[in-house]
Amino acid sequence: MLLLVRSRHSSVPRNSMLVRRLILVFLALFSLVVAPAVAEGQQSEQESRRVSDPPTLRRSLRGVLGGVPMTAADSMHQEIVRRLDFDSYKQLLLGLTQFGDREQGTPRNEAANDWIEDQLRSWGYETERVHYMFARRVGDVAEPREEVFATKVGASRPDEMFIISAHMDGRGGGEAANDDGSGTALVMEIARVLASSDIVSDRSLRFALWNNEETGLNGARAYVEQRAGMQGIEDPPGSGRYPEPTWIGMIQHDMMMWDHGNPVTHNQALDADVDVEFQLNSEMAAESAQLGLALINANRLHATDYPAVLSNAMSNTDSTPFMDLVAAVSLRENRRLYETGNRANPHWHQTTDLFETFSDADFMLGFNAAQTTLGAVAKLAGIRISR
């Protein structure tokens, strides 16, 4: 399976490059056909420019090229994925931005944790908190920190679990809308959909919103340190309750909305995509690659606008502490090391990381990542609608 996985920065066969160029040419020609028709409707300049956004183009292309044949199970999973709501995703993200950048150790971080917990409880979840100590530097007095998670207990395999996560803290003095309000809102929107009383999951699902990612993945590391040894233990014996089900897979979401190319362009790039990363140099690389491929396949079936691609250099996010223990992947707007790390996002950790900075084409990239994750987990965890 690993032989099928190739990093996007490796050399590309000439025929693959030709196909890629032909696709881009086709997209450009398609925009030339559609844009004049819209302009005739006397729309504003901004509305006319929106026609060339990737979501509009890809929706039209899917209509031309046709869909992917689905099984009955795929169709049910599609019905579940369609319960995700774009406006709800945006409203959750907007709600998070009221707390500014949610920097760890600040009152706004604590208030955001409370708000996240209140939202999860309003959908019917019982929530828990991970408590840990954090010191900024060696020798500093450690201070208490907290992070929230909620669980949908599996109907037939409550002892096994997928972790769906993002980090709720940020920095930079803005609103941390993209880093990582976009991932946090994504996880919360999936949790909202799966809270419905008619949705059943065979395996347990945990929605974790990490704290202290920006200071070195401290919240996720604390979770692993405290709970890895608890996996699969029934407590009390015979109760059917598993405080920490055995980890089957871990899916992290970190910076989900900005793929404007590098050099950066004003609009979302025509070849924008959801990046799924695993770490080749990890103990669970083969299993992580398989999880990544499941997400790629789910994207092809369920995502409405943006494709997904797989690469093998996952880094600098909360799935890292898990990667030697369980299949672990990270979903992102760009590859972390080769694109984000090379200034592909000018708003990263800046005061401009604001809700108002992003367009619907940007929000849609994050929403398509939600479709991708929910579609994959629906199949892997055995999620279904009880009729």
Where are these regions (language model features)?
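Alpha-helical metal-binding/catalytic segments enriched in His/Glu/Asp
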Residues: 150, 164-217, 373
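Bacterial N-terminal signal peptides
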Residues: 23-33
